[in-house]
């Protein structure tokens, strides 16, 4: 319980520090998630990104590299998936301009059927994506939803390739093979 209380306190403090340094964050996130049905969930993802980013920049040493998994740009793909039938990262230009730009963005991709199999193997039933507001009418299967999400992720990587280096990894091999691609 003590760890949970301390973690909550530090994360809250990190979030407030991030917002203080990025005063447009709250308005921008509220604007981009507004069209979605699951606005609280999307806002929570963006808050999580801000907390982890701020915690990282405030603790990383001068000789260290801050490496974040599932952060602002990853969550931008979630926002695109949830808010648009035809995802276009330019629709989130204000969001991507507000988000800290990484020196390198690693875009990891795998075929949709492999992603769903991995989700199921981890105990996830793969239903997170098909629960999007428009998913009931739009998708005939979880694979169709997964493919749309893959496309949103690829579009975000392509969009950000204009302002930063993007490393693309085809995640079809072993962990060692995929790691070697990044190195």
Predicted regions and their residues:
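Substrate-gripping "pore-loop 1 plus following alpha2 helix"
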Residues: 81-95
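NTP-dependent small-molecule kinase module
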Residues: 120-183
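Conserved phosphate-donor/acceptor-positioning beta-strand/loop module used by diverse small-molecule
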Residues: 64, 70-71, 91, 98-122
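ATP-dependent small-molecule kinase phosphotransfer cores
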Residues: 1-83
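Flexible, charged surface loops at secondary-structure boundaries
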Residues: 58-62, 98-100, 161
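Short catalytic/ligand-binding loop motif for oxyanion handling, primarily in non-cytosolic enzymes
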Residues: 74-77, 114-117, 176-178
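Soluble or luminal CAZymes and related metallo-dependent hydrolases
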Residues: 44-51, 87-88, 141-152
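Short, flexible, glycine/charge-rich loop motifs used to bind or transfer phosphoryl groups or to couple energy/partner
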Residues: 54-57, 94-97, 156-157
């Amino acid at each position: 319980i003590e760890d949970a209380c301390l973690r909550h306190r530090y994360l809250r403090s990190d979030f407030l520090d991030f917002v203080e340094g990025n005063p447009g964050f709250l308005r921008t996130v509220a604007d981009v998630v507004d069209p979605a049905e699951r606005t609280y969930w999307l806002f929570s993802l963006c808050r999580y990104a801000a907390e982890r980013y701020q915690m990282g920049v405030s603790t990383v040493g001068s000789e260290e590299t801050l490496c974040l998994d599932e952060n602002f740009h990853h969550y931008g793909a979630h926002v695109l998936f949830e808010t648009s039938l035809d995802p276009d990262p330019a629709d989130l230009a204000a969001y991507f301009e507000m988000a800290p730009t990484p020196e390198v963005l690693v875009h990891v991709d795998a075929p949709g059927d492999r992603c769903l199999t991995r989700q199921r193997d981890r105990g996830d039933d793969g239903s997170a994506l098909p629960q999007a507001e428009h998913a009931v009418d739009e998708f005939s299967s979880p694979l169709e939803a997964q493919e749309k999400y893959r496309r949103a992720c690829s579009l975000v990587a392509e969009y950000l390739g204009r302002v930063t280096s993007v490393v693309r990894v085809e995640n079809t091999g072993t962990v060692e093979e995929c790691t070697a691609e990044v190195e």
